[in-house]
Amino acid sequence: MAVLATLQSIGAMHVAYAADSVDPNTPLPSAHEAARQSSLPAVIVAAPRADSGKERLALPVHTGSRLGTSSLDTPASVETLAGDAIRARGDTTVVDAVTRAAGYANNAAAGNGGTAVSVRGFTGQESITTLFDGTKMFVGAGTVTFPFDTWSVDRIEVLRGPASVLNGEGGMGGVINVIPKAPQAERSTTVLLGVGAYGEKRMALDTTGAVDASRPGGPMLTYRFYLNDDRNNGWLPRGQSHSTAVGGALQLDATPTLRFTLDYDYARQMPTTYFGIPVQNSAYSSALTRQNYNVSDARIAYYDRWMRLKTTWQALPGLTIRNQFYFMLTDRHWHDAESYALQDDGSVARSDYIEILHHQRQVGDRLDATLDGRIAGHRNRFVIGTEFNSVNFVDTSNTPYDGSSVVPQLGFDPGVFASSDATVPVFRTRTNQAAVFTENRLEVTDRLAWVSGLRYDHIDYRRDTFATSSTAATSFSRTFANTSWRTGLVFAMTPDLSVYGQYTTGSDGVGSLITLSQANSAYSLSTGHQWEAGIKQILAGGSADWTLAFYQIVKKNLLTTDPDNPTQTIQIGQQSSRGIEWTGALTLPHGIVVDANFSVLRARYDNFSESVNGVTVSRDGNVPYNVPQQTGNVWLRWAFAPGWNVGAGVRYVGSRYGDTANTVRIPSYILFDASASWRVSHQLALALYLRNLTNRTYVVTSSNSGTQWLLGTPRSGGVTATMTF
């Protein structure tokens, strides 16, 4: 009620705060937009699209700010990947799509949910926040499992740099926001059937339309439903995988200014039970590249359910109120032998016979109001809001994960899972979070805008550890509070060229916040800040665009070994990164479009030590593990004849280190992909996709201090038939 009263008071201020009727989901008509629009759109609009490079900077983005400004007017590095372009390239997973954006590299493994990436020198689910339609599921035990498939995606927006001021704790490196397709009034149904290498079979359905299409004055109730099923025998022994996603939305335009949308998404994944191969001295035998050292009855399963109720109401001219209530459930199960080490006699020792089950439930609500108007004659947009979350997490496992075996490198019987440790409930946690946030954009002049933001988070945490045959039950509670803020300037040098600078702060938990251990309970959140400057430009009347960003991030309060006492851990560590990122898109005559980007960074531990055999060893100056310092992407698309398109792409990921000591060096890699499509008729399109054309053996990520490498998929391909009705 207090929040509603606050919003009512904002409405009362409307008399003194000269307002204009503006959709908060559209850019403010600054110098950039003034040349493009003479009137403002209605409050309820369809989701913007960015299918061509020329549109990417001019359309509003929602991941770098809640202000609804365009990328050109946002003082941050934001990139939009259109869903149609993603699917045209054959990128069926969110990770495949996102790692074509500047600076993002794949770190996905079964242990992190198959969705982890790195960017700007940071890696892990805690440091790169994943959103679904702007909503975050809190990270439990370093794992995020949804969203994962691109079939239902309208677009993916990525932000590079800290985002705590927008989404709370986490996101020191960046944000991935997966935005699903919305219901449309025009009826359309799409069916996809596909087959591919290694026994892949894919089926997908997407349908949308109006329930009351014949209603005089236009429909009020629209729907969207999707279904996707993908199964594969895998490229290595016991490599089967199967995923299913189903969901939809109902959208009610109750009045011209009031909209309700109810969304539900269900996903089931049974990914490949593969944890890589053992290596020594940064090398491995080529004979091991298609070996799977997991047990024969290994099992991994993820189940996710998301329900969201969204309300958008233009309460007054210039005042729009939005609310989203959400309920999410996730259940996960691992049943594996996950660690492998080469022995002196050439055999492979397997350990960590792990069985873990996660049950996570999250209920939350986000309410915000956007007020457009003028302050002393200057155009201003102001957002204020609150967010509440309650998260319950239960961990069941067979800790301390007893079980081991030794097998030959080749021609072995994989055996079955065997551990003397019982699988029992280990702990449960409850996390309650409350936040208040605000953003503001003031046009100081017709060409200069000041953008600022502030967020305060309060988190109450409790963990109950259950009693076992050898340990007593324990409990502890902890409270965290953090304030994040940012300030930035955007200067429009011309209507299509802007330069910007910003300073922002952020925070990360010491590990996953909702599964914080008692050993780490005394520590505060890790904090950080970023300086960033950049330039963005649209060229040739919209046929080309490019961006350039320079940044430096410093993250403090890392856990590090006490240099005077190797048995103690203290929170004084520091990690930093600085770098440059460039993106560009060019539309040429004869149907040729080129998208390209590159990133170069320097990431280092500035103050970080570890205990090695009871001795404190400094890692100062070393590169954080699993962080490539160079990445690059190019994709060329050519519509060489009516209905015909071909595409080709190259992806480069620089070398990385697999350990904090920087003794294990993981090689760089270059991958080549290609696609071709033919629209046979208005109702039918055929497509061919080829991946890793040179059959390059490459490392996706590493574990166990770099002695275990997870290899990527060899050369593969597939064909699809897409029917539209």
Model-derived features: positions:
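Structural signature of Gram-negative outer-membrane beta-barrels, strongest in the C-terminal barrel
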Residues: 251-255, 360, 379-381, 387-389, ...
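Membrane-embedded beta-barrel scaffold of Gram-negative outer-membrane proteins
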Residues: 213, 310-314, 318-338, 492, ...
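Transmembrane beta-barrel wall of Gram-negative outer-membrane proteins
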Residues: 188-190, 195-274, 298-314, 455
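C-terminal beta-signal and adjacent terminal beta-strands/loops
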Residues: 594, 652-659, 677-725
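Short acidic/polar hinge/loop motifs at secondary-structure boundaries
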Residues: 135-160, 179-180
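Extracytoplasmic beta-strand/coil segments of soluble accessory domains associated
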Residues: 63-79, 83, 89, 95-135, ...
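Gram-negative outer-membrane beta-barrel transporters
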Residues: 552, 571-660, 694, 724
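N-terminal periplasmic accessory domains that precede
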Residues: 94-97, 115-118, 170-192, 203-209
